[in-house]
Curated annotation (Swiss-Prot):
Glycosylation-annotated residues: 87
Protein name: GPI transamidase component GAA1
Keywords tagged on the record: Endoplasmic reticulum, Glycoprotein, GPI-anchor biosynthesis, Membrane, Transmembrane, Transmembrane helix
Iron recorded as keyword: no
Listed transmembrane segments: 20-40, 357-377, 395-415, 465-485, 536-556, 578-598
Organism of derivation: Saccharomyces cerevisiae (strain ATCC 204508 / S288c)
Presence of keyword Transmembrane helix: yes
Pathway assigned to this chain's UniProt record: Glycolipid biosynthesis; glycosylphosphatidylinositol-anchor biosynthesis
Role this protein plays: Component of the GPI transamidase complex. Required for a terminal step of GPI anchor attachment onto proteins. Affects endocytosis.
Membrane topology (Lumenal): 41-356, 416-464, 557-577
Membrane topology of this protein: Multi-pass membrane protein
Family matches, as InterPro entries: Gaa1
Length: 614
């Protein structure tokens, strides 16, 4: 205790506290910079690890794969008939496919959804199991690019026929043919766990096939694994998919990496995959779904296998990947649990765990907390009581901003007009500039609004970073320029009339604070103030959640055009229950509204101390 007192006296004597308080904006920037650097150094040698299989029972590629040339003619026969299904109705396709599945003993049923169409599924009961566990082989009729999944459907029925002849299965196998990998497949997964009569037990894992080409050959395999709302499949499942694919001689692509970059393994290639992974993880459900996203939320580990190119490996080689994966999963005696559920892949065989990448998002959250502290104490109004009118009004404005944000989130679910939303967002940014002579707030209130805004955003980011790291990092990065919005005090002439505040606050035993509001004749803004107003305007535009996420989509993802990302955020909630839309509306928008309110011109309040009356 004596040591702490001595240290405290030394700090006071050296005057470190005022210096630290004055440097709070710099400390906030350094925290954010540390967050960016800590994520950027992960691809450096020594910062990442090589992937490995944690669950020994999986044993990928330990057994010989039998889905080979013997199945070639059968697969081609199914494919030639599936080509004729392109112009058939969903009912006709499902009835024909269902008859094929029934030929080798599969129990089939059709799940009908008025909004998303029909989904055919069949259950093959395990000869060596008790019927309580299952594996899913999902084949959407149309893939994420709206291409008819001819090769995938042919592989699906061929593999089902192939699996039916094997007596080794201890888990049921469910084959699913949905209209698309998005809402149709998601609705079937929800119905399977709630209302379907024909079921095959708890689903342990799912593999989605995407082979839209009519060619016999393909070049490489893209493996997609990002789930909804920050979920990822157990790393063991991703590892066995990669291990089996490479064991069969095929190259693996992650996050849409083109074929000419698959052999690169240096700092820049790993950094690129890292950035693409964070982007795809944050926007999973908003981007075109691959199919594995549909299984999120039910403790089902899932990946999507997509074939690219038209030369190199034959189609049966592609079929050996799900065969070997099912044989590995079949060995499990319990659910996936040994390996990581939170990770970032830098290459097919290299990854970093949550302990390595989490500090970056934590640093951003701390940066907002420090900005909140700076707005609270680094001004002339630090000694105002916590129960003063300024603090109470700031909390009231925060509550109103929450209500407005909630109304916005619900209104645009009913009327998804991205153009209207962007127009309102852009117009709101100009309000402090347009109404600068009509609406004023007190300077203490401006600082308190910033204090509440940054504190709220820090709490949101901290709550989010454990369950959806990528989204926390994304919104923290895009919203951080808000901390540079400055309070603008209006210019005034020399004479002033003062009024005493009705809230005297004790600071010392014999002193009270007297708040004196300046009532001055305003003069035109100085060039410096005009410059700061324009700077605030630019910062408000760039940090508006809807404008910012739109710009991010346009610059960093070729999939989005115009205001598409706003509509897809809404549809992601309606179709997949992906709550990224509410993160923007309830987590980010209230903070931005508070900063918008704080950027209106303010009137200074003079703080004077007076001797306490007896």
């Amino acid at each position: 205790m004596a040591l702490l007192e001595k240290l405290h006296r030394r700090i006071v004597d050296m005057g470190l506290v005022p210096r630290i308080i004055a440097l709070l904006p710099v400390i906030s920037m350094l925290c954010a910079l540390f967050g960016f650097i800590s994520i950027a150094i992960l691809p450096m040698d020594g910062q990442y690890r090589r992937t490995y299989i944690s669950e020994n029972a999986l044993m990928p590629s330990q057994a010989y794969s039998y889905f080979r040339e013997s199945e070639w003619n059968i697969l081609r026969g199914y494919r030639s008939q599936i080509k004729e299904m392109v112009n058939m109705t969903s009912m006709e396709r499902n009835n024909l496919m269902g008859s094929w599945l029934q030929e080798f003993g599969t129990k089939t049923a059709i799940y009908e959804n008025e909004q998303y169409g029909e989904t055919l599924y069949g259950v093959m009961h395990a000869p060596r199991g008790d019927g309580t566990e299952a594996m899913v082989l999902a084949v959407p009729w149309f893939n994420s690019d709206d291409e008819f999944n001819i090769g995938g459907a042919a592989l699906g029925v061929s593999l089902a026929r192939f699996f039916s002849r094997w007596p080794v299965w201890s888990k049921n196998i469910i084959v699913v043919f949905s209209e698309n990998p998005r809402a149709a497949l998601r609705s079937w997964v929800e119905a399977y766990h709630t209302s379907l009569d024909l079921t095959g037990g708890s689903i342990e894992a799912a593999v989605v096939l995407d082979y839209s080409s009519t060619e016999d050959f393909f070049e490489y395999v893209e493996i997609s694994y990002d789930g909804l709302n920050g979920e990822l499949p157990n790393l063991d499942l991703v590892n066995i998919a990669i291990s089996i694919t490479e064991h069969e001689g095929m190259k693996v692509s992650l996050h849409g990496l083109p074929s000419d970059q698959l052999t690169n393994n240096n700092f820049w290639s790993r950094l690129k995959i890292l950035c693409l992974g964070i982007r795809d993880w944050a926007l999973s459900g908003v981007k075109k779904p691959h199919g594995n996203e549909a299984f999120s939320g039910w403790r089902i580990q899932s990946v999507t296998l997509k074939a690219h190119g038209n030369s190199g490996h034959d189609i049966t080689t592609f079929g050996r990947i799900p065969e070997a994966m099912f044989r590995s999963i079949n060995n499990l005696l319990e659910k996936f649990h040994q390996s990581f559920f939170f990770y970032l892949l830098l290459a097919p065989r290299q990854f970093v765990s949550i302990s390595s990448y989490l500090p970056s998002a934590v640093a951003l959250s701390i940066a907002f907390a420090i900005s909140s502290l700076n707005a609270f104490i680094n001004n002339a109004y630090a000694n105002i009581s916590l129960f003063s009118e300024y603090n109470l009004v700031a909390l009231l404005v925060w509550f109103v901003s929450l209500v407005i944000s909630f109304v916005v989130s619900q209104a645009f679910l009913l009327i998804p007009s991205s153009g209207l939303l962007m127009t309102i967002s852009m117009a709101s940014c100009f309000l402090p500039l347009i109404l600068s002579r009509k609406i004023h707030i007190s300077e203490p209130l401006s600082y308190r609004l910033k204090n509440v805004a940054f504190l709220y955003f820090s709490l949101v980011s901290t709550s989010l970073l454990m369950i959806n790291f990528a989204m926390a990092l994304l919104i923290g990065t895009l919203a951080f320029p808000m901390t540079f919005v400055k309070t603008i005090v209006e210019s005034s002439s020399e004479h002033e009339v003062t009024t005493q505040s009705s809230n005297p606050i004790k600071t010392e035993p014999k002193d009270e604070i007297e708040l004196v509001e300046n009532h001055m004749d305003t003069t035109p803004a100085t060039p410096q103030q005009q410059k700061q107003k324009l700077k605030n305007l630019v910062l408000l535009i760039l940090t508006n959640p809807f404008i910012s996420i739109t710009l991010f989509g346009l610059f960093f993802d070729d999939e989005f055009h115009g205001f598409d990302i706003i509509n897809k955020l809404v549809s992601a909630w309606l179709d997949l229950k992906c709550w990224s839309w509410f993160v923007l509306c309830i987590g980010w928008l209230p903070c931005w509204l508070l900063i918008l309110a704080s950027s209106f011109e303010s009137k200074s309040v003079v703080v004077r101390s007076k001797e306490k009356q007896s």
